[in-house]
Amino acid sequence: MKNKSFMDYRKIVMEVCCGSWRSAVKAIEDGAERIELCQALSVDGLTPSMNVLRRLRAKYPGVRIHFLIRAREGDFVYDDDEVAIMEADIREAVEAGASAIVCGALTPDNDIDTAAMRRWIAAAQGLPVTFHRAFDHVRDPQAALEQLIELGVARVLTTGGRMPDGTIATTAEEGIPALRALVEQAAGRIIIMPGCGVNNDNARRIIEETGAREVHGTKLNKKIWQKQNGLAAS
């Protein structure tokens, strides 16, 4: 049983959220297997420079770079022009070497904007798509998850979102019960990736209590995490 747990932990994916060229380089040099590239983390991330993506891809051709598409801060309800702008950004990111696209849109009623998502998924030209933390604000997480599965979205980045009492989890630790329910509902059809406040100290608890196999954070280092937990480096 111990060996099974060991092997499972070696397969955990830690995605490091990087808000600049320097933070991306540091994460990669520290051994990050995958990064999410964005900017303006103070407003929960915006679309970063395409030239940063191009330079990272040239310098680190083997690193998986998930690229955030978010045109502005604030809510996730976008008009037709904003949808078109982000559609064009996705196409450019694909050409610039992104490994996957991170995006998300909601309707005014806080449901998944399936029309926008279909356009963006098509623009991704077969690259995996992550639905970002707009998911935290959907009014019906279970129904929204089924919609994303039907759309072909690869993963959802979330704190767990809306809790049974109607409040929205502000961190992944707080949202553990909701995350566990989402992982169970997903049943391998889509990846549930806990994010917000995930670090080397609490990642193991979040993984064990939710069943998630990918986590996301700005302060993750898999090598340090494995050492802290007595696990061999992968």
Predicted regions and their residues:
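Structural motif corresponding to the early beta-alpha repeats
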Residues: R54-E92
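Active-site-adjacent beta->alpha loops and helix N-cap segments on the catalytic face
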Residues: W21-R22, L41-R64, D81-E82, L106-Q125, ...
